[in-house]
């Protein structure tokens, strides 16, 4: 039996087509992936991401515990701020990538990938020591994401909060939006400006409909997982299970900015990650652009002069660039921009070249 979010019945109202996504019945699209992608890049989109996991970590030893478990420097946080981090195994492989919100002096909210909830909680529990309490809140919290250049003007119609003063990776813990209390953060997974709203399950449908109504004249549309994937891919935002796995380190995956190997605390994977940061990693995540016809897909082999050098982690026809592009994890010595390589597509060898990433960067606000 597939799991469903509190918004399941609403999908049908708006024409949502659902798929099995890691055991969840979620909308892959409402209108079309291309239209939804375009709406988020130019106007706004609304996503149901309630399948994500939420774990509260509290207690006087919460900070020292998180410093031991996470690659980023959690001591940099203060209440009302969030950061992106990885959690690693001793060999540097990735347990998960996640967001940490500091709610108060000794209380943090971890937002983890849906497919990793049980694994992450088991890993955290195994290493808990001192005054630390872990509370799995995943089943009681729904999560909506409003993303795109018009996201702020849409939400401004529903709240008295001063959204313009909310900087990226900051949040308001008990914000009133459309008459409901939410944790409202300026975060997202699309490469655009945007907000995420963590709410009680019973408030999810009300908020979803209120946001859609508020965005009616702003070009906001409901969006599915298909557009979420093409948007994050163009912005080179890693997806666990593709760019990050237990066999791929955060350095290899290009998120070295979330690894603070000089922080005082020891953490899982520190020695391996420090060495990769200082001396370079054996593999590197690069951008591919096809020279010949063909779309690079997850798992396709990448070769240089017929010799395997890595594989594609994500690939598609980019809705924004109108090109066939991919991300690939390859041997570092072949990662220079401009290098020609081959991708094996349906037993045929197809030419591609290494290009700069991210493929898409949000235009600066004038």
From Swiss-Prot:
EC supergroup of this enzyme: transferase
The enzyme's E.C. designation: 2.1.2.10
Catalytic function, reaction form: N(6)-[(R)-S(8)-aminomethyldihydrolipoyl]-L-lysyl-[protein] + (6S)-5,6,7,8-tetrahydrofolate = N(6)-[(R)-dihydrolipoyl]-L-lysyl-[protein] + (6R)-5,10-methylene-5,6,7,8-tetrahydrofolate + NH4(+)
Cellular compartments per GO CC: cytosol; glycine cleavage complex
GO MF annotation: an example: aminomethyltransferase activity
A Pfam family per the record: GCV_T
InterPro entries found in the cross-reference section: GCS_T, GCS_T_bac, GCST_C, GCV_T_N, GcvT/YgfZ/DmdA, GcvT/YgfZ_C, TrmE/GcvT_dom1
Gene3D superfamilies attached to this UniProt entry: Aminomethyltransferase beta-barrel domains, Aminomethyltransferase fragment, Probable tRNA modification gtpase trme, domain 1
This protein's UniProt keywords: Aminotransferase, Transferase
Family: Belongs to the GcvT family.
Known partners and oligomeric status: The glycine cleavage system is composed of four proteins: P, T, L and H.
Function comment: The glycine cleavage system catalyzes the degradation of glycine.
Listed name of the protein: Aminomethyltransferase
Upper taxonomic lineage: Bacteria, Bacillati, Bacillota, Bacilli, Bacillales
Gene name per UniProt: gcvT
